[in-house]
Amino acid sequence: MNERKLNKDFLEIYEMSISGKIKKEDALEILKLDVYDLLHISYHLKKAFNKEKIETCSIINAKSGFCSENCNFCSQSIHNNSKINIYGLKSKEEILKSAKSIENYSNRFSIVSSGKKISEKEFEDILEIIDEIKNKTKLKVCVSLGLLNKSQLKALMKKNIRIHNNLETSKNYFKNICTTHEYEDKVDVIKNGKKLGLQICSGGIFGLGEDIIDRIDLLYELKELNVDSISLNLLNPIEGTKMREKINSKEIKSIEPIDALKSICISRIIMPERVIRLCGGREYVLKDLQSLSLLAVDGLMIGNYLTTSGRNIQSDLRMIEDMGFKKG
């Protein structure tokens, strides 16, 4: 392909993306481009929406393990055999201490709880913890608390915080990773939250054995739900999970770095105006290519994840700076 033709194709994709005219079949064709071409387009789309800053976020595993759901990738499920720390909801003091420790490095701090749902007592405790963090730090607070009901969503709306609820994968593929709750259960939480005016962060995991059509379907589901922030995770197959067994037995293949980058880029091209946030598994999958992802994303989770260790925070902040971006 000569340079003139390439530039014409870039411009056409760029303009289609800006105007929201990228269809599923277009996305599949665009993915045939070289990864560096996709990164080029993604970067210019970022610039078009003034996304020169990288919003950092961090999480605390506030309640760990003993989850009733059978998500085959999750080390916290009782249906898997991962060796993790199991504990109930941490105290207000512990969670506040964690928030303060990250305050100078992160824009957002999310309280994450294991399990399908939390009890009303736990929910009331978390509302108090939210107030404490908002009063004593400058962090924006988020929560990831499973399948929240309408009453809980209303209470969180009054606190003016963002909720997180991952769809994980496409509706069609979901039954391959979880059978103890329905895809629509998650969709309902997001829809109910949006109706109330809550900000929503949702996304999925690439590398669960899904095909590219499943990834595209997931992205369009997120687009149609109009979520504010798209959280992209890359599978880190944790020892003891059913997903790790599938990879060890060659039933499914681990996602390759270039494949992951292309999937991140198409997320930006489909939803150029949204926050595209790269989260868990980036160290494991992208390895030395992590910095390239910043050409497409404008959000980055830093610090440790739920049951796995993240990269050194200073290394991530230096990577952001070295790539010419600012923490925002």
From Swiss-Prot:
Binds 1 [4Fe-4S] cluster. The cluster is coordinated with 3 cysteines and an exchangeable S-adenosyl-L-methionine. Residues 49-273 form the Radical SAM core domain. [2Fe-2S] cluster binds at S110, C142, C201, R277. It comes from the Archaea. Pathway: Cofactor biosynthesis; biotin biosynthesis; biotin from 7,8-diaminononanoate: step 2/2. Catalyzes the conversion of dethiobiotin (DTB) to biotin by the insertion of a sulfur atom into dethiobiotin via a radical-based mechanism. Belongs to the radical SAM superfamily. Biotin synthase family. This is Biotin synthase. The lineage of its organism: Archaea, Methanobacteriati, Methanobacteriota, Methanomada group, Methanococci.
